[in-house]
């Protein structure tokens, strides 16, 4: 049977009819010449409505914009990550670095180029450069640092192509790492951080520019290139390079630098910058290096997935129902939902209908006539060939504004395509089974059995079947197991024994972050706020442009345009780095221990992270994702290999020819994932989403046709649908359909209605306070040794061991020992009888 024309689309798949290309949108609000005058009645009613709808679709790009070919990964391509390190204002410094290297190189090697030397000669010269970093004169030290930076940049003056530069970069970087450059740079960086003279002069300056951070920028550039290059694995890597990579990762995550991991030093730079004590710090480079350090030491998202599977096996939990990374990669984007103006217009038209109820019934009859999920065998082959999973085109049947026309004649092959199944396996928590059994027992028996999930005596057969289905899909998370174990430790501290804490990189990093974690979170969010495109320039906001503004401000229009692009790009890179750091830390801490994650998440919430992210999305998100804030001819390594063409206003405006900006889409997805992490299973935080009116903001973000971004937007909408009221759900049926199709289902989750217990009034403050108490108990038990209960500490009663302990006495005490003996021992009477008794 052929499907009826206009068969409902959102809950089921849309007809694949060949559509003619849409006409271009009109340039003005006036109708184009020859346009049908619907008001004058020159077209029949149905045609006029169809024309209006097409016009509206075209003007909004409604479902016509193509899917964005974006693949989410830990980082962008290596070349893009290298180019984002440098601002365009730093362009002249490439030649300065080359000059410093060649002056020094010619003093020792006169007849050969760097690329013509053998490995031993390379190593000798690298060690000679390293020795030059130990001189006391700042100018000489800076020249040597620039020479090392030129080596790390791939000695581009002797290369003829970008690929050759990148090849020499890898070789030179591993060479520099081998001779111990990174540790020497860490010491120099520490010295620059504590350079009070530079800090005080920067504080007094009214305007800070690139020149104020020269030393720091050179050091951070070299360190970033080492971390980024060593972290990237290539097929042609030598065996010793792989060994060096593993050693470097271990060292970077170990407390070798001032008894703390290197990342803590960078976090310290961030807080010092935000406090106003060091406004000259090049924050973009610090944040990029911090992100790559965390990524290198803790591991990326695929590594995290394998660690999660491994940890589940250790805890005796069943394997994950699916690989979430693969599922998301195979998803297709849905069409953007209709805008509010469309919905209002449709409702007004419906209000004027005389036979509204009848029409709705007709639509529902047509909808029920043919169940699209009952796919017959004849359609299987076609479904296998068609992987377009998107919800396109048609509005939901209840949203229609006209009686359904008679079926049109379609070709035989043009069938209604149906999804094979939902992408995610449903999950059920133990708590959900308990609640279901409790309500069933109250209803059928009249009493409850608490947390007993096995006794089903007296319950009818259908309830037995329901419980069986729920238990089949039961999912126990690592976090639940960790929380139960923590309760056991607190309940029985003596019989529980000493907890064995595995010193993995995430644990070491958490221990380093713990004393000042609230300050670190506030500092990162302050910078994120300053870099957000929606934030207005305020006098009290921090200046994040210290490492992009030149000493002399531009004098021509072209220079101003170039600086404008540079500043926007600079802010985008900062947002990218902060969003990636926060997401990585949240995910790794959640895997390591749930209360480490909750501690960080709670401080993010207290620092207003939720409204900040919503404020970020309260902009034209399509414009942000398709922004062209880059000048490809000035990107490294292109700019050091090719002749620089003359820049024009047109070339600056054109930007690159990419469909979207990778870093901006990456940032948006990261921020949505952070928002999901903060609000998941937290009713108080979900209510913050409702209070801050996030639904229209998030709904606008659905216009971006990228499956992963849409998934996280739909997740955030799903958790608050029960609070948004019946009218919102009725007006947003297409969004509800997309949630049903793309977001994981909880079998007895009444998310689409307001009947759930969770939707009733809740003591939000008590919820956060209880969580905070659990976190504080965890931190005190595991990390706060000073406040341990003395009754549970081991006692040494052996006289020999006490007398054998070495006691370091202060020098002044040793000099006045005779005086102390006379005053404290000999002059005081001792009652020997009482002492011996």
Swiss-Prot record:
Instruction: Decide whether keyword tRNA-binding is in the record.
Output: no
Task: Provide this UniProt record's keywords sorted from A to Z.
Answer: Acetylation, Cytoplasm, Phosphoprotein
Where is this chain primarily localised?
cytoplasm
- The segments labelled Required for STRIPAK core complex formation in the record are 796-837
Output the InterPro entries linked to this UniProt entry.
Far11/STRP, Far11/STRP_C, Far11/STRP_N
Region of interest called Disordered, as start-end residue ranges on this chain: 1-67, 336-423
User: What is an example of a GO molecular function annotated in this UniProt entry?
Assistant: protein-macromolecule adaptor activity
Disulphide bridges in this chain? Answer: none
Record PTM Phosphoserine, positions in chain? 59, 335, 339, 788
Report the domain of life of the source organism.
Eukaryota
Q: Where is the composition biased (Acidic residues)?
A: 378-391
Show the GO cellular component annotation of the record. cytosol; FAR/SIN/STRIPAK complex
The keyword Cytoplasm belongs to this UniProt entry's keyword annotation: yes
Q: Which family does it belong to?
A: Belongs to the STRIP family.
Subunit field text: Part of the core of STRIPAK complexes composed of PP2A catalytic and scaffolding subunits, the striatins (PP2A regulatory subunits), the striatin-associated proteins MOB4, STRIP1 and STRIP2, PDCD10 and members of the STE20 kinases, such as STK24 and STK26. The STRIPAK complex can be extended by adapter proteins such as SLMAP:SIKE1, CTTNBP2 or CTTNBP2NL. Interacts with CDC42BPB. Interacts with CTTNBP2NL.
Which PANTHER family would you find in this protein's record? PROTEIN REQUIRED FOR HYPHAL ANASTOMOSIS HAM-2, STRIATIN-INTERACTING PROTEIN 1
Query: Can you name this protein?
Result: Striatin-interacting protein 1
> From what organism does this protein derive?
Bos taurus (Bovine)
């Amino acid at each position: 049977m052929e499907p009826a024309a206009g068969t409902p689309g959102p809950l089921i798949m849309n007809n694949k009819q060949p559509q003619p290309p849409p006409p271009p949108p009109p340039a003005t609000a006036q109708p184009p010449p020859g346009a049908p005058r619907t008001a004058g009645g020159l077209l029949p009613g149905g045609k006029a409505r169809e024309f209006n709808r097409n016009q509206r679709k075209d003007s909004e790009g409604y479902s016509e914009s193509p899917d964005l070919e974006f693949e989410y990964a830990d980082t962008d391509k290596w070349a893009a990550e290298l180019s984002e390190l440098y601002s365009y204002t730093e362009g002249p410094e490439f030649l300065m670095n080359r000059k410093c290297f060649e002056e020094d190189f010619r003093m020792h090697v006169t007849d050969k180029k760097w690329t013509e030397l053998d490995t031993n000669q390379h190593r000798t010269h690298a060690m000679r450069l390293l020795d030059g970093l130990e001189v006391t004169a700042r100018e000489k030290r800076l020249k040597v640092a620039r020479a090392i930076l030129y080596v790390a940049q791939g000695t581009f003056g002797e290369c003829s192509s970008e690929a050759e530069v990148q090849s020499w970069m890898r070789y030179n970087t591993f060479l520099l790492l081998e001779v111990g450059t990174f540790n020497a740079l860490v010491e120099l960086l520490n010295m620059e951080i504590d350079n009070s003279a530079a800090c005080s002069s920067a504080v007094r300056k009214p305007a800070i520019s690139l020149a104020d951070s020269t030393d720091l920028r050179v050091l951070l550039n070299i360190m970033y290139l080492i971390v980024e290059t060593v972290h990237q694995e290539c097929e042609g890597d030598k065996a010793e390079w792989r060994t060096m990579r593993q050693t470097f990762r271990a060292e970077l995550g170990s407390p070798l630098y001032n008894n703390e991991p290197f990342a803590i030093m960078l976090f310290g730079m961030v807080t010092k910058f935000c406090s106003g004590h060091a406004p000259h710090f090049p924050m973009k480079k610090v944040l990029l290096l911090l992100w790559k350090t965390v990524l290198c030491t803790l591991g990326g998202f695929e590594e995290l997935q394998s660690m999660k599977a491994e940890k589940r096996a250790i805890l005796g939990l069943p394997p994950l129902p699916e690989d979430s990374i693969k599922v998301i990669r195979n998803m297709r984007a849905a069409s953007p939902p209709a805008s509010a103006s469309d919905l209002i217009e449709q409702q007004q038209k419906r209000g004027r209908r005389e036979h509204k109820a009848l029409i709705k019934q007709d639509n529902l009859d047509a909808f029920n006539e043919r169940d699209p999920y009952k796919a017959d065998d004849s359609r299987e082959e076609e479904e296998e060939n068609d992987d377009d999973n998107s919800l396109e085109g048609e509005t939901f049947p209840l949203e229609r504004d006209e009686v359904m026309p008679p079926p049109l004649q379609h070709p035989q092959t043009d069938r209604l395509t149906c999804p094979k199944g939902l992408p995610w396996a449903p999950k059920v928590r133990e708590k959900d089974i308990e609640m279901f059994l409790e309500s069933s027992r109250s209803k059928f028996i009249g009493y409850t059995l608490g947390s007993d999930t096995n006794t089903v005596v007296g319950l009818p057969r259908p309830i037995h079947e329901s419980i069986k289905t729920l238990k089949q899909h039961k999912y126990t998370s690592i976090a639940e197991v960790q929380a139960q174990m923590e309760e056991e430790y607190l309940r029985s501290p003596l019989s529980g024994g000493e907890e064995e804490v595995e010193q993995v990189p995430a644990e070491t990093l958490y221990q380093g972050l713990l004393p000042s974690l609230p300050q670190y979170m506030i500092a990162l969010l302050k910078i994120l706020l300053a870099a957000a495109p929606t934030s207005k320039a305020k006098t009290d906001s921090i200046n994040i442009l210290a490492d992009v503004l030149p000493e002399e401000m531009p004098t021509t229009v072209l220079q101003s345009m170039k600086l404008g692009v540079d500043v926007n790009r600079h802010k985008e890179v900062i947002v990218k780095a902060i969003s990636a750091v926060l997401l990585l830390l949240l995910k790794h801490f959640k895997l390591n221990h749930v209360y480490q994650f909750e501690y960080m998440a709670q401080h993010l919430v207290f620092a207003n992270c939720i409204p900040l992210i919503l404020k970020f999305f309260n902009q034209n998100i399509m414009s942000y994702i398709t922004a062209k804030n880059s000048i490809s001819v000035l990107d490294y390594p292109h700019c050091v290999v090719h002749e620089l063409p003359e820049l024009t206003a047109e070339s600056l405006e054109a930007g690159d020819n990419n469909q979207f900006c990778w870093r901006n889409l990456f940032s948006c997805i990261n921020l949505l994932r952070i928002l999901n992490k903060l609000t998941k299973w937290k009713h108080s935080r979900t209510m913050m989403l409702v209070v801050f009116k996030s639904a229209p903001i998030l709904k606008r973000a659905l216009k971006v046709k990228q499956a992963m971004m849409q998934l996280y937007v739909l997740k955030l909408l799903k958790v608050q649908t029960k609070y948004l009221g019946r009218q919102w759900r009725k007006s947003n049926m297409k969004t509800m359909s997309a949630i049903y199709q793309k977001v994981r289902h909880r079998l007895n989750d009444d998310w689409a209605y307001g009947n759930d217990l969770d939707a009733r009034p809740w003591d939000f403050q008590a919820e956060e306070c209880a969580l905070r108490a659990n976190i504080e108990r965890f931190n005190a038990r595991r990390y706060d040794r000073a406040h341990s209960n003395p009754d549970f500490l081991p006692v040494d009663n052996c006289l020999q061991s006490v007398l054998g302990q070495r006691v370091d006495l202060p020098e002044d005490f040793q000099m006045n020992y005779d005086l102390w003996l006379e005053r404290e021992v000999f002059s005081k009477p001792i009652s020997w009888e009482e002492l011996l008794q």
